[in-house]
Structure formats: structure tokens, C-alpha cells
Amino acid sequence: MDVPSSWDALRKQARKIEAQLDEQMHSYRRLVSTKALSKSDGNESDLEAGIDLLLRQLQQVNAQMQAWVSSGGSEMVSHTLTRHQEILQDLTQEFYRHRSSLRAKQEHASLLEDFREFDRTRLDLEDGYGSEQALIKEHMGINRNTAQMDGVISQAQATLGTLVFQRSTFGGINSKLSNVASRLPTVNTILAAIKRKKSMDTIILSLVAAVCTFLIFIYWITK
């Protein structure tokens, strides 16, 4: 920035910077008032840097005006300097106030975003835990079904073994029955012969008894 050589040039320079500051402060006020709760971006940073630069330039011009007044300026010049100094002070205070408000909003937004991120992480962990629990339950269900299937297979194998044993037992019985059946004709023949022999013995005994009785009767009559 060129250094003005006269009071009028300093005043013009001060008013020019003040006008630029008014314009940028208007934009900054609107930004702060309408800024949604979000983290910092490049818009306010660029605007703040421009305002801060203009404030430093206005401060330098005021310092030059102060040096001019100190070198023997009139009371009117001193009053003009005071007015420019008040404008600089008001703009500086307003800028710092709005910037503090914006920083508070940004910090609040950052905290909210951190909490949201924490909630998302927690939900992701809970979802992961829920999925893990579901897999564990599914695995346990498969194990239970496998155990039940093993039990059914064991029972089936035991039943099959019993049936095989019974089949072999019945096979032995059938074999014995077949043996007996094959020998029955011989047994029947023997039994029939025994019965016939008993019948003959009975007949003979009966005849002997009858003869003896007849002889005794004859003997008794002739006596």
C-alpha cells in the first residue's frame, strides 16, 4: 500500500478501506447469521482473511493520520482522526464478536458430528455383534440338528442290528423246524409201530385173561 503524502490522501485512503470493510462485514454478518451448524469450510476462512487484512491496513492509515496530527494538525483534523479511530475500533470489535460466534457454532457442529460418528460406530458395532450372535445361534442350531440326526442314525443302526439278530434267530428256528419236519415221518412210523405193539399186547393179554377165566370157570363147575 502506497503511503499518502497529505492529510486528504490519508482520509481518502481511510474511507476507501472503511467502505471495503463495510461491504465485507455485511457479507460476514450474513454468513454468520445464516450459517448452518457445520464444520469450517473455505468460505468464511477467505472472508475472515480479507477482513483481517483490511483492518490492518486501516490501522496503518490511522497510525499515519495520528502522526500527521501529532506534527501540528488542527482541532478539526484531530476530531476527524478520532472518528476514524472509533470506526476502526467498532469494526474490529464487531468482527471479533461475529468470529467468536461463528467459532462457537463450528465447535458445536463439530461436537454434534463427533456424537453422530460415535452413534454410527456404536450402531455398526451393535449390528456386527447382532450378526455375530445370529451366526452363533445358527451354528448352535446346526449343531443341535446334527446331534439329533446322529441320535436318529444311532437308533436306526440299533434297530437294524436287532432286526438282523431276530432274523438270524428266526432262521435258526426255521432250520430246526425244517429238521424236525423232515424227521417226522420216521417218528410217526415208530410211534405207530409202538401203538400197534401195545394194541397186540392188549389183545393177547385180554385173550390170556379170558382163557384163564374160562378155565377157572370150567374147573369150578367140574369140582
UniProtKB/Swiss-Prot annotation:
Vesicular side of membrane: 223
Keyword Transport among UniProt keywords: yes
Cellular component terms (Gene Ontology): cis-Golgi network; Golgi apparatus; Golgi membrane
Keywords: Coiled coil, ER-Golgi transport, Golgi apparatus, Membrane, Protein transport, Transmembrane, Transmembrane helix, Transport
Main location: Golgi
Residue ranges that the UniProt entry lists as topological domain Cytoplasmic: 1-201
Pfam families reported for this sequence: V-SNARE_C (PF12352)
Membrane topology classification: Single-pass type IV membrane protein
Keyword Transport listed: yes
Any one GO BP annotation for this protein: protein transport
Location of this chain's protein in the cell: Golgi apparatus membrane
Task performed by this protein: Involved in transport from the ER to the Golgi apparatus as well as in intra-Golgi transport. It belongs to a super-family of proteins called t-SNAREs or soluble NSF (N-ethylmaleimide-sensitive factor) attachment protein receptor.
Subunit structure: Component of several multiprotein Golgi SNARE complexes.
Record family assignment: Belongs to the GOSR1 family.
Record-given protein name: Golgi SNAP receptor complex member 1-1
Organism: Arabidopsis thaliana
Gene transcribed to yield this protein: GOS11
